[in-house]
Amino acid sequence: PIRVGILTVSDGCSAGEREDRSGAAVVAWVASRGFQAAAREVVPDQIGRIASVLLEWCDDLRLDLVVTTGGTGLGPRDVTPEATWPLVRREAPGIAEAIRLRGREKTPYAALSRGLAGIRGTTLVVNLPGSTGGVMDGLEVLDPLVEHAVGLLRGEAPPHDPPGVAGEGASPVRGGAP
């Protein structure tokens, strides 16, 4: 199974002042997909604490996917991208762009998210916003991508046609000769 780490970044949640609804939404999504929630933690908005967990989960536990929630906005304490950026070896900008685009369908404020997506070793790391709506938007984007992405990172060769596209007897060439 795909092994997932869920890291909530929130001063309020880490202090026990607020319920971690966004992390709970990710856990529910992981279960609904049949993935394994291999690690879950809540940390304050501190670069060192965030980076420490990311390093452990990517390098030691070698999780397939790490989803962070929170700390991606413009506020002075929002530092999740700053903690993530130095640790990822390769970017996956299309994922972060797609998450922002999905959010923009519902609120213009989604454009203010600075969340990143990238790869460390064989782990895909994705920063999601802290709001439950932002998390749901992000999970909608990740849903059709995760298994293919993890397969590629594992060195497997999954089929390249996404569900409902080409394959299954359909011609990938439009307007070509009969």
Protein language model annotation of sequence segments:
Residues 1-178:
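Non-catalytic beta/alpha edge segments that cap or flank active sites
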